[in-house]
A protein has these predicted regions:
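Short conserved segment of the HATPase_c
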Residues: 128-138
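Short alpha-helical Gxxx[C/S/T] motif in the catalytic ATP-binding
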Residues: 149, 153
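Conserved micro-motifs of the catalytic ATP-binding
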Residues: 41-44, 76-79, 141
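Short beta-strand/loop element within the Bergerat-fold HATPase_c
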Residues: 103-115
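Detector for a conserved hydrophobic position within an alpha-helical segment of the HATPase_c
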Residues: 157-158
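Conserved catalytic submotifs in the C-terminal HATPase_c
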Residues: 67-76, 82
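Histidine phosphotransfer helical core of two-component systems
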Residues: 1-26
């Protein structure tokens, strides 16, 4: 900067350099925010949650494509509604992103299996090429991803005494995410 005469492209070089610094700073900020969210998941504050109402609300929040609903039996679970909503929003968002790759659809539904509730999100995307890293913190295949979405989802499921699994569908193309929760407590 102290050189005289200044190179003709100095301003362009400085702008490019500042652009790189800004991009890396933004990426680091996203990483740190994600890390903090992972480290500070609060314990669930449970109350009765009507699953039909929760599923309808989550489906209505998606604006990129309509999300089908496969209604199940009337079911109430004791859970943290905000945490379950965040979990389902993330699963639906992932399903929509996958379905947009193929022009497919997304459906969310639920069913009872004895004293367990299964909430599932089916997409008609390309499916999962590999499942080993699905729940590895900070692993992502998305350009702007943080790699914590499914990790947080699994933490929420487990904090409620439940499980979360993802697998390629057997009944057609795409993936099925299944949240299993105890009915009547957790």
């Amino acid at each position: 900067l102290d050189r005289e005469p200044r190179p003709a492209d100095l301003e362009d070089d400085v702008r490019r350099g500042l652009g790189v610094i800004t991009a890396r700073s933004d990426a680091l900020s996203r990483f740190m925010t994600a890390y903090a969210r992972l480290a500070r998941l609060p314990p669930p504050r449970t109350a009765p949650v009507d699953i039909a109402e929760l599923v309808r609300r989550v489906a209505s929040l998606e604006t990129r494509m309509p999300v089908g609903i496969a209604a199940g039996p009337d079911t109430v679970v004791h859970a943290d509604a905000d945490q379950l909503e965040q979990l389902l929003i993330n699963l639906v968002r992932n399903g929509v992103e996958a379905a947009q790759e193929t022009g497919g659809a997304v459906r969310i539904g639920w069913r009872r299996d004895g004293n367990r509730l299964e909430v599932y999100v089916d997409d008609e995307g390309p499916g999962l090429p590999e499942t080993a890293n699905l729940f590895v913190p900070f692993f992502t295949t998305k350009p702007q991803g943080t790699g914590i979405g499914l990790v947080l989802c699994r933490q929420i499921a487990e904090a409620h005494g439940g499980t979360l699994t993802l697998a390629n569908r057997e009944d057609g193309p795409g993936c099925r995410a299944v949240l299993r929760l105890p009915v009547g407590g957790g």
